[in-house]
Amino acid sequence: MNENSISQYSEIDLISDNPFKNYFVVEKLLNNNNNNINDTIGNNHYSNNNNNNKFLNNNNKNKINKKQIILKVQKKSNKAMKELTVMQKIGYYSNHVVNVYGYFNLKGCDRMLKPRLLSDNDELIFMECEDMGQYQTLEMIIERRKCKGSLVMTRFIMRGILASAYYFESHQVIHQTLHPGNIYILEDSLGTDDQSVVKFSNLEHCLLIGSTNSSLSSLSSSTSSSSSSSSSTNCNNNTTENNNNNYNNNNNNNNNNNNNNNNNSLNDRFVLGKDSVCYSIYSDRHQSRNLFKVVSSNTVSFTVGIIYLELLLSTIYDHVFPNEEYINSLREIVRNGKLDIYTNQATNTKYFRFNQNHQIEITDLIKDDISLILTLLQDSSTRPTITQFIIDYLF
């Protein structure tokens, strides 16, 4: 596809954090049956004058599930290079990720679409868009207490999270900022057997295991030379592995420092400072909570354990915690690396003490869940990886 064929398509506005700092162009719009609605959208498609907006006036906006689009690449940013490398590592068609490169709004529609990378070459990135209106983040579920009274739903979501985490781990990818705001759930499919409805996002924060400290400039040249081979559905795994060996994550220095400090009392659960496990903030553009930053392979298990605990609390506990108290209590659990479990000797009843003001009885209904969480939160020397946890405790 050349410049002349691209120029006939309309631009779509992107939010400011688009990693390519360029623009999308529409190739065609698809309805539910994948029939072509309109191969070419005129220049007035996004006009404020609704009389000129044939697409919206034809009420086709409700038919869009996916859009095939082309991203014209002039210069790949560092963020884009990281995401592209992760996608090459795990495969462009992974069902375990809500895909990358930011959001954009379709003007006039109450929709938020997120592009999915299909393939790439030296000049173009071919993508399709996923309608994010059908998803909600795990953070939304926890805050809205959508799982209230439904341990079945809680366990289903956790199975999906474990399946996605296993997929990442088996491809030697560590998601460094895994938290409820980075996990998307396909709401309409909850309760089904399709575990791919739970997906991870923010792939630019992933770290490829075994990566070196080579520069992004060398990565850029190596990625460009191999991109044509990765544009097909079945990527050349050998080429991808070679590219990934050259991958440089900006957080490598932090990760190396963490490894040097593994002998201290805090072990690999967190590092002190802004990018620490204890770091919590609501100041980013999506208002996501970031309690911890994953720094090694089996720390992913620890992170999933905290997520499991949050989801369980939102399901079984009636009390709504003040936000600061809730965050501080989670921070203490992360810092200590364990749950505070005690037994009432008079009644021989076990309790989980979330903080000084809130204790939760460990009934037969949730004792297995608590046991699994304790396994995920144990000391790093004995804590299982996601793969080990699934094999040893779930089968």
Swiss-Prot record:
Question: Where in this chain does the record put each Protein kinase domain?
Answer: 9-395
Q: Which PROSITE patterns match?
A: PROTEIN_KINASE_DOM
Gene Ontology terms for molecular function: ATP binding; protein kinase activity
Tell me if Nucleotide-binding is a UniProt keyword of this record: yes
Q: What is this protein called?
A: Probable inactive serine/threonine-protein kinase DDB_G0293746
Q: Which InterPro entries match?
A: Kinase-like_dom_sf, Prot_kinase_dom
Q: Which cysteines are joined by disulfide bonds?
A: none
Q: Where is this region: Disordered?
A: 213-266
What family classification does the UniProt entry report for this protein? Belongs to the protein kinase superfamily. Ser/Thr protein kinase family.
User: What's the domain remark here?
Assistant: The protein kinase domain is predicted to be catalytically inactive.
Residues engaged in binding ATP: I15, S16, D17, N18, P19, F20, K21, N22, Y23, K54
Keyword annotations for this protein, in alphabetical order, are:
ATP-binding, Nucleotide-binding
Record has Hydrolase as a keyword: no
